[in-house]
Swiss-Prot record:
One of its GO terms (molecular function) is glycerate kinase activity. It is found in: Cytoplasm. The keyword Nucleotide-binding applies. Its main location: cytoplasm. This is Glycerate kinase. GO terms for biological process: protein phosphorylation. It catalyses: (R)-glycerate + ATP = (2R)-3-phosphoglycerate + ADP + H(+).
Amino acid sequence: MLLKPHSRVQVFEGAEDNLPDRDALRAALAIRQLAEGLTADDLLLVLISGGGSALLPAPIPPVTLEEKQTLTRLLAARGATIQELNTIRKALSQLKGGGLAQAAYPAQVVSLILSDVVGDPVEVIASGPTVASSHSVQDCLHILNRYGLRAALPRSVKTVLSRADSDPHGPRTCGHVLNVIIGSNVLALAEAQRQAEALGYQAVVLSAAMQGDVKSMAQFYGLLAHVARTRLTPSTAGASVEEDAQLHELAAELQIPDLQLEEALETMARGRGPVCLLAGGEPTVQLQGSGRGGRNQELALRVGAELRRWPLGQIDVLFLSGGTDGQDGPTEAAGAWVTPELASQAAAEGLDMATFLAHNDSHTFFCRLQGGAHLLHTGMTGTNVMDTHLLFLRPR
């Protein structure tokens, strides 16, 4: 960013690869100093989005930045959700969990928020720097036990947790703070739905709260495509009672709130042309290998593997998964798209899908398949409101 001469704006860059670093720590301490100098006559405007946790690291002494960073990496590698990661971050931070609001008191605080978290909980987004935390030390210990990390905690982390009060981290009322959601996955899906309808699709938003294990989610989408076939083409044999029940069991297993599954099935049963099912959220990938990829490319690859399991008859199916920020994991792609022909296309080029999945190497797979034709490239969008999943179904 180029500033005008004598500008009062200060720009701090940091958190390369979305990980807290010394530059981000320097910025966080400067922000704290600015906030602590405000009075009741001041207004603090805070812009919050995904990545805010990494950009505002200020560990509570004696915890060091490196110790906090290592713990976050270990939790993420073992499949911790963003909510769980942020609960730990808040417990170890001076500014998260309402700490920034506390530092700015008694100034008025207005936070404009882009949500990158399922359900848009303001206390979780960027670890809630302007929202009092409702989590206790016991919540943190429960998370650490779940992922087998409590025994391996550094002494400094144990010290901070042992002396932490279980009361909210920030002021009890936060009456001087106004938090406003200005962008979210719900809004993104609503616009995508309008665009799909303009293209002639019957469009249904399944949920903006898709989360859970990426394997189970892929199974859900694969089976959904099969069950959808029987609704779109009534002349074909219908899905069995067992398959319908299995689809609902998978949905229950994923614990998707407000899932509009019945509405989607009823829309397809009316048989009025092509259908676009939309969903959004953030699945969890447990890392087992050292390959390159991201959750969108992994989900797309797994859905492609699932689609070959089911007879899809006289409908064309395409599944796309993409990150709204334009970057899926440490790759240049936003995601990928697949069709039921993926398995045969891969086999024709000597690519074993199972091997790539075992190494979490979805990006390498899609780069090699047909010269990268299945990759979704949008460039960086500057806005992260999680992922979007699109399932297109068109009778032939």
